[in-house]
């Protein structure tokens, strides 16, 4: 057989636009922002439910991107990928419920807070496509702010609360509560990975890209006395 009978070439008309240079395009990739463990035993979430406060600073990959700007305003799309620790898909039904900032969170798997007619819920089986929900802009301020010089609360601040310095209360986006649905306890340990994608993005005051390791989750401090270059030496490149 000749080459032309094995490889068929077609005319492709590529189209490009300035939309590929927008903030929406730059932030349009979903990134990991949280992970929830629902084990069968232990001290963390052993009762088949968990509350995850929305936090996009827990993983450096997403945090470095948002800290390219001082202020941002966006809607967030969350995708929940659930499986067992071995990656197996099991016949388990889950409920994901969004709890706005300040609203009461469920304190047990059978709490009546799960039956509220106010908070939106999504029910999905592990064999279904991953649950996906959108959360609108939630801040009482005009934008989320990634650089904040202050405490998250008013009043007296004791020394043991120093690690909270730099956490901005305007960035609170709410909580996702998840539970296994059923009258009896689930027999499967589960791991839920949460991915976030930003939509309708507006941003102000660009900043240099982060290239040093983080020290704390609440603020962007770095070790100024031990700065390390992140790139490899280019002296030997030929």
Q: Which positions does each model-derived feature cover?
A:
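Viral structural modules
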Residues: 1-238
């Amino acid at each position: 057989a000749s080459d032309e009978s094995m490889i068929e070439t077609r005319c492709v008309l590529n189209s490009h636009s300035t939309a590929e240079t927008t903030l929406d395009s730059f932030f349009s990739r979903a990134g990991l922002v949280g992970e929830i463990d629902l084990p069968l035993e232990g001290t963390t979430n052993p009762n088949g439910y968990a509350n995850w406060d929305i936090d996009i600073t827990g993983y450096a990959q997403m945090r470095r991107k948002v800290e390219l700007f001082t202020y941002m305003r966006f809607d967030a799309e969350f995708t929940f990928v659930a499986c067992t620790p071995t990656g197996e898909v099991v016949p388990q039904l889950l409920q994901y419920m969004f709890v706005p900032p300040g609203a009461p969170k469920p304190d047990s798997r059978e709490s009546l807070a799960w039956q509220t007619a106010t908070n939106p819920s999504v029910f999905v089986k592990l064999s279904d496509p991953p649950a996906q929900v959108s959360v609108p802009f939630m801040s009482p301020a005009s934008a989320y702010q990634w650089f904040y010089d202050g405490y998250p609360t008013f009043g007296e601040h004791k020394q043991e609360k120093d690690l909270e310095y730099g956490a901005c209360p305007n960035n609170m986006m709410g909580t996702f509560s998840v539970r296994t649905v059923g009258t009896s306890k689930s027999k499967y340990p589960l791991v839920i990975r949460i991915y976030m994608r930003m939509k309708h993005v507006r941003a102000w005051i660009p900043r240099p890209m982060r290239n040093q390791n983080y020290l704390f989750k609440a603020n962007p401090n770095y070790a100024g006395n031990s700065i390390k270059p992140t790139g490899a030496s280019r002296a030997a490149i030929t």
